[in-house]
């Protein structure tokens, strides 16, 4: 999911 991506940001 994109949630994990935002976690990195």
Curated annotation (Swiss-Prot):
GO terms for cellular component: extracellular region. Keywords: Secreted, Toxin. The keyword Secreted applies. The keyword Oxidoreductase does not apply. Expressed by the venom gland. Its main location: secreted. GO terms for molecular function: toxin activity. It is found in: Secreted. Belongs to the cationic peptide 04 (cupiennin) family. 03 subfamily. This is Short cationic peptide-1f.
């Amino acid at each position: 999911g994109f949630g994990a991506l935002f976690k990195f940001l």
